[in-house]
Regions:
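Bacterial N-terminal signal peptides
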Residues: 7-15
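Short, surface-exposed interaction patches in beta-rich subdomains
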Residues: 162, 178-258
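An anionic oxygen-ligand recognition environment, strongly enriched in 2H phosphoesterase
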Residues: 158
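Acidic (Asp/Glu) and glycine-rich low-complexity loops/linkers
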Residues: 5, 19-133, 137-151, 162-169, ...
């Protein structure tokens, strides 16, 4: 059951269609954020907090050059923080029917330039899924769930201050990094394809699986078992005293943290 959940979760994340598919043209120029190729709107410099109504959700899907702050709460809410003339270009909506997800992105055809990336502050009651595509970064204060799955594709990073879960599965494709600063997830699985790294060395776990295809590195913490499969130059560093099963093709390695 454990292996089935972890494998199925990562496969579903990899196959998930992209909501808000947009050109991800976001060069970093003089600390400005530029998005899109059409007629461009320049940010006014007047930063506002725009609170928006929304219905309940259990997942967050982010696309584009928007940063997200996730905050555990006893309610659901969303606040858009950006220039007053850019806020109308940032879309937030709940979709999905039986599995509602908060979709965050940029309106089709929008093109803008701001001094800093728009920020969407999300309060949530419960969260079981986080999908990040593009250049947006996500920061979460704490997440508590039975099963939690996460997907990063592109250059966006995800940082979680504290995670409490029974099962946790994460898939990284691209250069985005994942950092989990603390907590516990009994069963963990990570799939890395690209150059993105995982630092979950402070996320305690009992059983951990890592699959790397590329140059990404993973730091994990396992007390009983560690299964590592590496194809390429990626490395797995571990804490704890797990029983290790490893399959390596390439220059990658598995070693204990110093």
């Amino acid at each position: 059951m454990k292996t089935l959940f972890l494998a199925t979760s990562i496969a579903l994340l990899a196959a998930m269609p992209t909501a808000y598919a947009r050109p991800d043209n976001v060069p970093d120029l003089l600390a400005a954020v530029t998005f899109g190729t059409g007629e461009r709107i320049n940010g006014s410099g007047r930063i506002i907090d725009e609170r928006r109504p929304l219905s309940a959700f259990g997942a967050v899907h982010l696309t584009g050059p928007v940063d997200v702050e996730l905050k555990a709460s006893d309610r659901e809410s969303v606040t858009v923080r950006t220039d007053d003339n850019i806020a109308p270009l940032i879309e937030t909506r709940v979709t999905g029917g039986d599995r509602p997800a908060l979709e965050i992105g940029v309106k089709a055809g929008a093109s803008f330039r701001t001094s800093r990336a728009p920020v969407v502050v999300v309060e949530f009651r419960a969260l079981s899924e986080l999908v990040v595509r593009g250049s947006g970064d996500v920061r979460a204060d704490r997440i508590s769930a039975d099963d939690f799955v996460l997907s990063l594709s592109g250059s966006g990073d995800a940082k979680i201050d504290s995670l409490q879960a029974h099962r946790f599965a994460a898939a990284l494709a691209g250069s985005g990094d994942l950092v989990v600063r603390g907590g516990r997830a009994e069963e963990q699985a990570y799939r890395l394809s690209g150059s993105g790294d995982v630092d979950a060395s402070r996320l305690e776990g009992r059983s951990v699986q890592v699959a790397i295809a590329g140059s990404g590195d993973a730091s994990v913490n396992a007390s009983e078992t560690l299964e590592a499969t590496i194809a390429g130059s990626g490395n797995v560093t571990y804490r704890g005293s797990p029983r290790i099963t490893q399959r390596i093709r390439g220059s990658g390695s598995v070693h204990r943290a110093h």
